[in-house]
Amino acid sequence: MNNLGAAITSEGIRFAAWSSSARRLWVSIFDETGDHEIERLELQPEGEGFYALFVAGLAAGSRYGFRADGDYAPERGLWFDPDKLLTDPYAAEVDRPYAYHWRLAARRNEGADTASLMPKTVAKALPAAPPILPPLFRPGGLIYELNVRAFTKLHPDVPQEQRGTIAALAHPAIIEHLQKLGVSAVELMPVTASIDERHLPPLGLSNAWGYNPVTFMALDPRLAPGGLTELQDTVTALRRVGIGTILDLVFNHTGESDRLGPTLSLRGLDNQAYYRHRPDGGLVNDTGTGNTIACDHPVVREMVLDTLRHFVRQAGVDGFRFDLAPVLGRFDGLFDPEAPLLRAIAHDPVLCDRVLIAEPWDIGANGYQLGNFRPPFLEWNDRYRDDVRRFWRGDAGMVGTLATRLAGSSDVFNRAGEPASRSVNFIAAHDGMTLADIVAYERKHNADNGEQNRDGHNDNLSWNNGVEGDTNEAAIIKARFDDQRALLATLFASRSTIMLTAGDEFGRTQQGNNNAYAQDNAITWLDWTGRDQALERYASALAALRQAVPALSDTRFLAGEPVEASGVPDVAWLTETGEPLAETDWNDSSRHRLVMLLGGEDGRLAVMINGDRRQCVFTLPARDGFQWRPAIETQAIDLLRPLPGRSVNFMIEGRTGNGGAGKGS
């Protein structure tokens, strides 16, 4: 593979691009402002679709873009137009954010040159790369999903000039918060340069999430005004305190959208090669965005691998989350867990030890692939999300299903006899209702998105505790608080990796909006001054307990087998009376209570779950030489007092005379 992009030497810059269908390619050189084209030079063919040109006298900091000419026949997937300035697919930096304009989508000869509308690629000498260190994150840890801009936009302790940027994540106040939650790794929602969907600007809206990239390496200047160095420094600062960094990357589509979308980069260079097409020439839309990246094309495959290696080598990230990951595994249109790209990622010497997380669905044929990725890929587990919500909503017959989810979802991840779960357990994520909204809204409230509430999922498996949305009724407020505690406790008690979305630990709300991608405003910005500090303290106590009791974060499936030489089963499932759940209990559709008793050589942990609305006294089995104590001091109740309805309590069994494991304030 030829080296693509801009390679800087002491004598000048070598520019290289690839296109299998273009007849001519140029590089346009701009002045230091990026506003004036000062030279347009034709690249020379080097065979197999590669074009290159060495330009003497240019130095780091030079601004440029590509242009391509060839047939223009959109009905056949050919979009060549030399009036369209194109971002280098290998751009590591662009000089300004993208902004949608109708001329970017104009047909050939219908609009003026687009150079004035386009960011320019900056030829940069990459900063000195940090040493490549093993990932800090290990399966079973806590992933903290966050939107860089929304997370610190309103944080009072972060300097104004840093708010909403990657650099803010290294601020001491942010690090302290992450440490209190026991965060193993932050998962940054997309930080690469993206463009608004064309319907948003007329509505006065903008894309707040970033899942609409143009190219894959260049960081968004709004999120990383300091460029790659800013990301590198932040990753290093977080690593210094034991927190890894995972990047959420979008390789399934780009912001060039459908046939009515803008021509920004890949479309103008070789639309037929970079995107998947139907036999009639139309774009395949397995993503719901108008196009689908052709990850089975060798040049695209290498570009994805180069991007991943870039962020490992240059920024030191722990790993990646892959949005709509089945697209990466589609070969000739069908998903294959052994597809060349997935196999290459898993076996690449730079990438093979990284954290790899798949969102295991897209909207294409057979797009739901939960459990079908191969190790080492972890997978977002939406069945966990839905089943936990159903249990706490009060659905009948959910006790057995809840136990399976708590135990690592062996029905999903043990199909091939794997010994450990690859589940990423979560109850709420960026896409959907927040944790607080799950217990306050029965239906979505997306009118602010400008689509007459048509967007977003309709089945949220949520409940409102008696009133839809805001209320001043104390009883409803308390019920919602209790439900959030119960949901958090269930998550932290679950085997395998867990994920918490930023702000859910202190009751953030989006006012019922379950698709807030277009709300770059107070709907998504975290309100640090109005957070529920009692809920936050409870989340911190849960984190401390999970760290103190390894059985909670172990990724091995719970099977009721003895733990090592202790003879104590790894799990026992009990009724509230302390007796093993019999088949009739498992099949009792009215049952909403159970105890998960985790075994350990030095003592057991009891997770007592009361999903009923009525309080109940729970009884735990006693052992000579051991004593049950509250595992979290804020739940300091004895076993003679009833466990309140819709709550979870933790008791730890220690040898007589020893203290408990977890603390909370």
Locations of regions flagged by a protein language model:
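Short, polar loop/linker segments at the starts of domains and inter-domain junctions
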Residues: 38-41, 155-172, 441-446, 637-643
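Short, flexible loop/turn elements at secondary-structure junctions
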Residues: 19, 45-47, 57, 70, ...
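Substrate-binding/active-site clefts of carbohydrate-active enzymes
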Residues: 147-317, 324-350, 412
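Carbohydrate-interacting/catalytic domains
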Residues: 1-144, 149, 178, 471, ...
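Conserved alpha/beta catalytic core and glycan-binding cleft of carbohydrate-active enzymes
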Residues: 331, 337-502, 506-507, 515-519, ...
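Core domains of carbohydrate- and sulfate-ester-processing enzymes
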Residues: 68-129, 198-206, 212, 241, ...
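Hydrophobic faces of well-ordered beta-strands that scaffold small-molecule active sites
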Residues: 142-144, 186-188, 245-247, 320, ...
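Conserved, mostly hydrophobic/aromatic
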Residues: 17, 66, 146, 188, ...
